[in-house]
Amino acid sequence: MNTFPAPAKLNLFLHVIGRRDDGYHLLQTVFRFIGYSDQLGFDVTNDGVIRHLNLVPGLTDTDDLCVRAAKLLQKRSGKEMLGVGIHLSKNIPLGGGLGGGSSDAATTLIVLNRLWGINWGRERLMALGLELGADVPIFIYGRNAFAEGVGEKLEVINLPPAWYVVLTPPAPISTAAVFASRELTRNTIPIKMAAFSMAQGHNDLELVAMRLQPVIAEWLDWLKGRHGSTKVAMSGSGSCVFAEFPSESAAREVLRQLPDSMSGFIAPGLARHPLSDF
């Protein structure tokens, strides 16, 4: 069984600039892929059955975005006679704001599009992915991007090489709970990316997430106390926090200082999704 990567993403900033009539929030953010991935294997069958061969603890078939993605693609493409067994090796933490579930769904769509002989273009796959979640399209798009709308309006952005220290507090957060908070700022002034410095950006979800899980503030403060970082922030709706460094050696030195009571990893920023040309 061949395996395929489903990389994590970071939101280098995340501004909430409004809310649509249907309740969805309007965002501006920059997505960056990092070299830290789940791994998925696919065993194509001819029985029309979609199976998850090793369901992740804490997830049901209903919650499993890989299975949902496969079933949606199977139905819309008319490939009901084809099935698949999906094996997921999970590395990206659940509820961490790193897009793990969305990335798994995107890799499922990208790979089965090829293995099932559907061969749709990326735009069609992105539209299908949006039905599964607002973060799924960026992983199908395959490039670091400035995103607007609910996260589906994407524009390629070229980012300099960087390394990231990502801390993983044991405090998963519900994205829905963060966005539902009355304390959430929803009126950040929209920016034009061409005239914007990444260092100016912030994450409007941080304060709400820190109230829901105070440990996030403690881990974020620890990162802010390290020297040499060019940016420190929370990713997505949390709970993971990160610091950006210009070199691998600088990132490794900070990880070396990490107290035993904390957990995390380092990863390089990627120029594009590893399956961008698949």
From Swiss-Prot:
Organism field: Nitrosomonas eutropha (strain DSM 101675 / C91 / Nm57)
Gene Ontology biological process terms, A to Z: isopentenyl diphosphate biosynthetic process, methylerythritol 4-phosphate pathway; terpenoid biosynthetic process
InterPro entries for this protein: GHMP_kinase_C_dom (IPR013750), GHMP_kinase_C_sf (IPR036554), GHMP_kinase_N_dom (IPR006204), IspE (IPR004424), Ribosomal_Su5_D2-typ_SF (IPR020568), Ribsml_uS5_D2-typ_fold_subgr (IPR014721)
Gene3D superfamilies (alphabetical): 3.30.230.10, GHMP kinase, C-terminal domain
Pathway(s) where this gene product acts: Isoprenoid biosynthesis; isopentenyl diphosphate biosynthesis via DXP pathway; isopentenyl diphosphate from 1-deoxy-D-xylulose 5-phosphate: step 3/6
Name by which UniProt lists this protein: 4-diphosphocytidyl-2-C-methyl-D-erythritol kinase
Transferase keyword on record: yes
Keyword Metal-binding: no
PANTHER family attached to this UniProt entry: 4-DIPHOSPHOCYTIDYL-2-C-METHYL-D-ERYTHRITOL KINASE, CHLOROPLASTIC
Keyword annotations of the record: ATP-binding, Isoprene biosynthesis, Kinase, Nucleotide-binding, Transferase
Gene: ispE
Function comment: Catalyzes the phosphorylation of the position 2 hydroxy group of 4-diphosphocytidyl-2C-methyl-D-erythritol.
Annotated signal peptide: none
A Pfam family the protein falls into: GHMP_kinases_N
Catalytic activity: 4-CDP-2-C-methyl-D-erythritol + ATP = 4-CDP-2-C-methyl-D-erythritol 2-phosphate + ADP + H(+)
EC number: 2.7.1.148
Gene Ontology terms, MF aspect: 4-(cytidine 5'-diphospho)-2-C-methyl-D-erythritol kinase activity; ATP binding
Lineage per the UniProt record: Bacteria, Pseudomonadati, Pseudomonadota, Betaproteobacteria, Nitrosomonadales
Family recorded in the similarity comment: Belongs to the GHMP kinase family. IspE subfamily.
Binding site for ATP: 93-103
Active site: 9, 135
